[in-house]
């Protein structure tokens, strides 16, 4: 997102394996290391890293926060909604919130990020829309991703209301010679029959196999997904399924 100060060193996103390696290098090699953001050319003052702020309270955000706690960081998780794990009912989310707080994650809910700035000592400050300031030595953005459909649009493929590529049961797009699978597509919800975006590894794996079957001449088809999701945190698990 185009937030003020987002290109400061020490601010990372979590989307690719290189992103994860950059975070590890920043932590392990010390602060005299560029964050990898492409619009900033400075260095942060050399100092121990003990404070982390994670932006986003879904899968990646919570799992990242847990790993930072295990690395000895004081972790604050900032989420613009009034709960973590939005698919959960609020009373269930409260159980998760209480559990992770007992294990060292400080939650700042119902408060969006307004921007970032660098303090005089070289550390970072996360500014929120409520006016609060969260000091940090590393900031990790775990805000989720949108389907990358630029190529599909250029090819004239049908794009759904949720922003994904529309496919049929055999993973064919609106052009029958072009197949699409994975996080960039819209699929039918197994329960409601409505179009949905399901960014999960299990369905993506199955879709790839079905597309390969169809290309090879087999009559395989994707029957939809229930979006079953499970997250493990500090030895416990939370899960949900259905519409």
Language-model segments: which ranges?
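Glycine-rich flavin
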Residues: 1, 19, 188, 219-225
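Glycine-rich dinucleotide-binding loop and its adjacent helix/turn
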Residues: 1-71, 106, 167
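FAD-site-proximal beta/loop scaffold in flavoenzymes
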Residues: 7-39, 122-127, 132-214
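Short beta-strands and strand-loop turn motifs
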Residues: 49, 55, 77-80, 224-227
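A Rossmann-like FAD-binding core segment of flavoenzymes
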Residues: 69-169
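Active-site-proximal substrate-binding core of FAD-dependent oxidoreductases
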Residues: 194-199, 213-243
